[in-house]
């Protein structure tokens, strides 16, 4: 088996995690108490979904997941929610005090006390696997727990499981919408370790997803639940080929191989199509070509950056539902002819496609329509650098005055760590600039202005 362990850290990680596991259960017909009426091989078996769920002798299916937070309220919602019987109580780890939006608290003072317990639980899950493939790590980098404890856990996972791949689903701060004043600090400090310790990181950003909900689903005031359900569709599409037997399966390691040209350049954009409400879906049938085109629309991107400002290096298209390879090839050929979608000249093919015949499921009473086919795109584009440069500018404004720095130093950090992390990100911006302009004959002189 090729098992994956999911690790959900901090409020964002846990709430996205809830949406994901709810969707996985629906897709596999697993009830909230973990029973699965449709399962033929009770108590074991090598069904494809066993990559994400382990089975007990009593026929109960338990997610291979750990939820960690430094304060109890969010995890208590899982402990009392609809799916409380799904998880083993040991998998829900909560501390007593908050990281208070402070990276240093999450990474040094408070995170340090809980991290061994987490690694213990992860070790138990790993021992329960026959062929652990890697980790999916969910967190946000704006807060204290997701950024601080998230980085700490990633660093420790690198030590304990060096060769296993780590995929991150990371919520980055939005350009306009901010949830805390010190977001830029936490993000820069956290990205510093994401650079080193994740193999692929998918960037998500609340504002971009708000806009998609508002525009495509006609939700006037989207809640986090709306956002998370959309994100869970993306993550479900990515992991579908691990959980179902498909036509063109895509492994976790394949994402890495196909999307990451250089180790540091591993921050991905994601998009999902079709995002339509039930009343709209009633009137339109979406072909493979149409959903492929809309996945490439700049407005479909789940992070606020415009792919037209950069070039694509590689791109992974995961189709699910009623899709045949012939349609996919035609759709991809059309995309290649478009002038607005530019690939770097050193990567001429750039497309990796996966097809899974399991049609997308939707949460009952949710906002998304039930459709026959859907596509999820993960792309490596140089335009991602816009996300970083935005944060860096805000970081510099605050750090030039050393505003709020004493909170971090008081928790045992050194000022040198700020400048080290900031230099690392400056180097990353430079890396992206170079990748975008390699082998250029100088016919595009405006390449430098975008960054």
Swiss-Prot record:
Post-translational events: Undergoes a tyrosination/detyrosination cycle, the cyclic removal and re-addition of a C-terminal tyrosine residue by the enzymes tubulin tyrosine carboxypeptidase (TTCP) and tubulin tyrosine ligase (TTL), respectively.
Principal EC category: hydrolase
Binding site for Mg(2+): 71
Cofactor(s) recorded in Swiss-Prot or TrEMBL: Mg(2+)
Catalytic reaction equation(s): GTP + H2O = GDP + phosphate + H(+)
UniProt entry keywords in alphabetical sequence: Acetylation, Cytoplasm, Cytoskeleton, GTP-binding, Hydrolase, Magnesium, Metal-binding, Microtubule, Nucleotide-binding
Main location class: cytoplasm
Keyword GTP-binding appears in the UniProt entry: yes
Entry's Gene Ontology molecular function annotations: GTP binding; hydrolase activity; metal ion binding; structural constituent of cytoskeleton
UniProt site (Involved in polymerization): 451
Residues the record marks as active site: 254
Entry binding sites for GTP: 11, 71, 144-145, 179, 206, 228
Positions of transmembrane segments: none
Listed GO biological process terms: microtubule cytoskeleton organization; mitotic cell cycle
EC number annotated for this UniProt entry: 3.6.5.-
Subcellular location: Cytoplasm, Cytoskeleton
Residues where N6-acetyllysine is found: 40
Gene3D superfamilies, per the entry: Helix hairpin bin (1.10.287.600), Tubulin/FtsZ, C-terminal domain (3.30.1330.20), Tubulin/FtsZ, GTPase domain (3.40.50.1440)
Role played: Tubulin is the major constituent of microtubules, a cylinder consisting of laterally associated linear protofilaments composed of alpha- and beta-tubulin heterodimers. Microtubules grow by the addition of GTP-tubulin dimers to the microtubule end, where a stabilizing cap forms. Below the cap, tubulin dimers are in GDP-bound state, owing to GTPase activity of alpha-tubulin.
UniProt family annotation: Belongs to the tubulin family.
Subunit structure: Dimer of alpha and beta chains. A typical microtubule is a hollow water-filled tube with an outer diameter of 25 nm and an inner diameter of 15 nM. Alpha-beta heterodimers associate head-to-tail to form protofilaments running lengthwise along the microtubule wall with the beta-tubulin subunit facing the microtubule plus end conferring a structural polarity. Microtubules usually have 13 protofilaments but different protofilament numbers can be found in some organisms and specialized cells.
Protein name per Swiss-Prot or TrEMBL: Tubulin alpha-2 chain
Organism classification: Eukaryota, Viridiplantae, Streptophyta, Embryophyta, Tracheophyta
Gene behind the chain: TUBA
